From Swiss-Prot:
The gene is MT-ND2. The lineage of its organism: Eukaryota, Metazoa, Chordata, Craniata, Vertebrata. Belongs to the complex I subunit 2 family. It catalyses: a ubiquinone + NADH + 5 H(+)(in) = a ubiquinol + NAD(+) + 4 H(+)(out). GO terms for molecular function: NADH dehydrogenase (ubiquinone) activity. InterPro entries: Complex_I_Subunit_2 (IPR050175), NADH_DH_su2_C (IPR010933), NADH_UbQ_OxRdtase_chain2 (IPR003917), ND/Mrp_TM (IPR001750). This is NADH-ubiquinone oxidoreductase chain 2. The chain crosses the membrane at residues 1-21, 60-80, 110-130, 149-169, 179-196, 200-222, 240-260, 274-294, 323-343. It is a multi-pass membrane protein. One of its GO terms (cellular component) is mitochondrial inner membrane. Core subunit of the mitochondrial membrane respiratory chain NADH dehydrogenase (Complex I) that is believed to belong to the minimal assembly required for catalysis. Complex I functions in the transfer of electrons from NADH to the respiratory chain. The immediate electron acceptor for the enzyme is believed to be ubiquinone. One of its GO terms (biological process) is mitochondrial electron transport, NADH to ubiquinone. Its EC number is 7.1.1.2. It comes from the Eukaryota. It comes from Varanus melinus (Quince monitor lizard).
Length: 345
């Protein structure tokens, strides 16, 4: 893609997200989401591969339908109460429509089916954008309207997302699909706590973006797309393979890595609000996600790759990609747990 066009698309995507995050008017929030969607569609389809074209078409249809549903909810609210302020929602159907529209944009269960299929058809860096940056604007709207969102609806969607995200990733051999189900499960943890402690949802979102960026940048750097490719990761660099192992374990929420802190705080908050059965069930079902993380780490860093050559490291050209961003994300992925109390005060 032409660098100028690429810069314009990325700038439009950033502008759309910022516009939505700073909006309290229905139309401006909707406009930001539409700008975001229209900017990323050419990025998804830039390889001109049939899978990329299919992925961009699916993404457009899903996002257009959810945007139309959100605008419809705004029109109903304006017709009934004469206000376009997104924080003033008093009608129950409007609340349900808005929550359903934003849940569709995020890929929450039971409207999650589009996310794994789209990620499978795009390059790794584009998949990284879809699973991180594209979650910011809808989540910002949910956090803005947290006191009007139906709590039973968010608890149900969050619980289903944790279960489906864990079970869906168990039999996956494609790393991008595995990361899609990982995204669904993590979004489930965020949406469960949003009507109770929205600041904890924001904290979880920031950490999720950090962990996912670290993991998928390593996949991009080593050109790993399947579990079979991950087996060869230690041949490229044992340090990278070990870093990939720690990043996946952090995504799984194992202490003493940074990924333990959001799950720990969310479970503590649920128990404080007398939601002990929900907290217990979510803690148990997250073991499904941990299972496929452990399987991937075992394959990538704890097994020797098949080799027909007498040397340990395979021949390769000097990599020309920068690892500065990967280094920063990896440090945050591994060492944020000790300062968790400071960040959540």
């Amino acid at each position: 893609m032409n660098p100028i066009i690429n810069f314009i698309l990325l700038s439009s995507m950033i502008a759309g997200t910022v516009l939505t995050m700073t909006s309290h008017h229905w139309v401006s929030a909707w406009l930001g989401l539409e700008l975001n969607t229209l900017a990323i569609i050419p990025i998804i389809s830039k390889t001109h591969h049939p899978r990329a074209t299919e992925a961009s078409t699916k993404y457009f249809l899903i996002q257009a339908a959810s945007s139309a549903l959100m605008l419809f909810a705004g029109i109903i609210n304006a017709h009934l109460y004469g206000t376009w302020d997104i924080t003033q929602i008093s009608n129950n159907p409007t609340k349900i429509l808005l929550t359903a529209a934003l849940a569709t944009k995020l890929g929450l269960a039971p409207i999650h089916f589009w996310l794994p299929e789209i990620l499978q058809g795009v390059p790794m860096l584009t998949a990284l954008i879809i699973t991180t940056w594209q979650k910011i604007a809808p989540m910002a709207l949910l956090i803005t309207t947290w006191n009007t969102i139906p709590t039973p609806m968010t608890l149900t969607m969050g619980f289903l997302s944790v279960i489906i995200g864990g079970l869906g990733g168990l039999n996956q051999t494609q790393l991008r699909k595995m990361m899609a189900f990982s995204s669904i499960a993590h979004l489930g943890w965020m949406i469960v706590i949003i009507t109770i402690t929205p600041s904890l949802t924001l904290f979880n979102l920031v950490l999720y973006i950090t962990f996912t960026s670290s993991t998928m940048l390593i996949m991009h750097l080593t050109m790993s797309k399947t579990l079979q490719n991950a087996m060869l990761m230690s041949s490229h660099s044992s340090t990278t393979a070990n870093l990939f192992l720690l990043s996946l374990l952090s995504l799984g929420g194992l202490p003493p890595l940074s990924g333990f802190s959001p799950k720990w705080l969310i479970l503590q908050e649920l128990i404080t609000h007398n939601l002990v059965p929900l907290a217990t069930t979510m803690a148990i079902t997250t073991l499904f996600s941990l299972m496929f993380y452990l399987r991937t780490t075992y394959i990538s860093a704890m097994t020797l790759p098949p080799s027909t050559t007498p040397i340990k490291n395979i021949w390769r050209l000097k990599p020309n990609s920068s690892t500065t961003m990967l280094s920063m994300f990896s440090l945050a992925t591994l060492f944020l747990l000790p300062i968790t109390p400071t960040m959540t005060q």
